[in-house]
A protein has these predicted regions:
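Membrane-embedded alpha-helical segments of multi-pass membrane proteins
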Residues: 10-14, 42, 134-141
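Transmembrane helix-loop-helix hairpins at membrane boundaries of multipass inner-membrane proteins
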Residues: 1-7, 14-110, 185-206
Length: 212
């Protein structure tokens, strides 16, 4: 299941890059559109297969004893992963006519696919650090989609989007370090809310401030 988990996360980005670089897909819009739809259909199948792998855990990177990029497949994550894959597939099908006149369709499609990889990574995140990393990847990868039309208005919107995102990222990073210090871990576990409630009052206050 570990290999399947890695595929489910990184397949869209890998497929998008391959389609973008394949000579036959550069000039043939119809072939490229079919390839993107096929890749997204495979991604949907992968996320559906991961529904049978609930409980799968994997550490991708150890930064410290408490801060690490780890994945944890649970029912909630599986539901959102299947939902995201379905939405992306349907969006790709309906976007063919909408984007058909666009001269930069290839560039849009590769970032479209890469953003899905970041979203799937969030769905299977096993800690606040993992969620943060994949969320910031999604933010950076979606900037080219915001400025896609390359008009002054689109560029201004992209800059504003990036500034807001960076500011939010700084606050999120501070929150992660705070919780890591008070709780000793930022790993998602059952009963996490009760754990936060039993922590020192400072951590409880921060939970109330950061929680949506």
């Amino acid at each position: 299941m570990n290999i399947l988990l890695i595929l489910a996360i990184f397949w869209p980005a890998l497929a998008g890059l391959v389609i973008f670089l394949t000579p036959g897909c550069k000039e043939n819009k119809q072939l490229r559109g079919r390839a993107v739809n096929a890749a997204l259909a495979v991604e949907l199948a992968l996320t559906l297969a991961m529904c049978m792998g609930q409980g799968t855990k994997m550490v991708l990177l150890n930064m410290t004893q408490t801060l690490r990029i780890e994945m944890n497949v649970d029912m909630t994550g599986c539901i959102f992963a299947v939902l995201m894959s379905t939405m992306w597939l349907l969006s790709s099908v309906f976007a063919r006519e909408y984007m058909g006149h666009d001269g930069n369709e290839r560039l849009y499609q590769v970032f479209f696919m890469c953003v899905l990889s970041a979203l799937i990574g969030q769905c299977y995140a096993g800690s606040m650090v993992t969620l943060y990393v994949f969320y910031e990847l999604m933010t950076l990868l979606s900037v080219p989609m915001v400025v896609h039309e390359r008009t002054p208005q689109a560029v201004a919107a992209g800059i504003k989007y990036l500034v807001y995102s960076i500011f939010g990222a700084m606050l999120g990073l501070l929150g992660i370090f705070f919780f890591s210090n008070y709780l000793g871990t930022v790993t998602f576990v059952p009963g996490g809310v009760e754990t936060a409630a039993s922590a020192p009052s400072g951590a409880t206050d921060a939970t109330a401030a950061i929680a949506p």
